[in-house]
Amino acid sequence: CEDLTVDSVKIRNPYYAQNGDGIDVESCTNVHIHHSTFETGDDAICMKSGKNAIARRIEGPCSNVYIHDCLVNEGHGGFVIGSEMSRGVKDILVENCTFVGTDVGVRMKSALGRGGVVENITLRNIHMSEIKGEAVILTMSYVLNSLNRNETIAMENEEDIPYFRDLSMDNIEVTGCRQFTKLEPLQGRPETIRNVVVNGQKLA
């Protein structure tokens, strides 16, 4: 899709709803989400672009997304990318948002087999409170359903290796969390997460 606007929308799902995401933006470009409220049983605001090899043939990237002045009140993740991101997610700006009582604040998740690149992601002026787990987690170990039962992925198959790069997070304020940041690149491939800066500190 192209030219998607979500303005002043309130989305509520039961806390126990399996896969009860608020909004999943998949392979869309020119997206504006603002002044909206989310209370969900899973990820609240999520960017995606398809899963594994089939997505790399038929889907397009998720790109040019502007999210601002949104409230996430409970849910699994406040702002999330993945794990379906095989065609890439890029050029995203998230600012002036509040996450309260979520399991994690910001999560970017993928796994070997997904492929794709997440890049040029900016978050600023994000306020979090009562976060149950990590405020910010970037993980390549999200393996749930990442491979088909009859599919084998080899590390040397470059198109199956995902990357997170050029991620900037500034003025991230957190009141209450188990851990502020956590980075989990692919085992033996530290370069799969690189150029990550949070509140002026370079983490990768």
Question: Model-predicted segments: where are they?
Answer:
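Extracellular/periplasmic carbohydrate-active domains that bind, remodel
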Residues: 1-204
